[in-house]
Amino acid sequence: MANFLEIKIPVRKDEGWNEWAKEMRSKIKAAGIPVRWQMFHYHMTLLFLDDDNCIEDLNQEFEQCMSLFYSLPITIDKLDAFTAGDGASHIIYLTSTQIPSQILAVAEDARTLADSMNANYDKRSFKPHVTLGRVPADKVSLEQLQSVLHRIEKPVFRCILNEVEHRYFKGDKIKTWKLKY
């Protein structure tokens, strides 16, 4: 069963989040863009695994990896979109213009661990982002979507990343790690 390792992104704790998100969704709707919004569970996927053959072994290794990974601040300050790998949808996302090197390092470590166990995982290059919604690619071009997004006021949300979770895709948690301060 598909599962993934993610860093939880606590943007909802930011005072301006709800207002900004509501306004952003309203402007996109007013532009006539159909979006299937992802609500409430905001995260940055570090590793997407296609099966669960080695979950116990991976979790032991992830445990060691997470013991070396400290909580860290991040500023979410960019709204954009890209086309998903299958080409069927465009992903509306948030990210940081300055991704902390620790995030890149832990994603690389997770992939190295998965490789060492011959785990079947998504090997596309790591693109740190927080998915907000999906737009059908047959309804709106990426250029049209980006044109609308780039007219929306840029977000600036500061948060502390302090929790990593291994979970089944659209399902139960497998393991949660609270990061050290």
Whereabouts are the PLM-identified features?
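A generic structural signal for beta-strand entry/edge sites
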Residues: 2, 89-91, 163
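Short beta-strand element of the conserved SAM-dependent methyltransferase core
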Residues: 5, 93-97, 166
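Short, low-order "capping/linker" segments at domain edges
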Residues: 86-96, 172-181
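Extracellular/lumenal ectodomain signal focusing on beta-strand-rich modules
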Residues: 76-78, 163
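Short, low-complexity Ser/Thr-rich regulatory SLiMs
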Residues: 83-85, 168
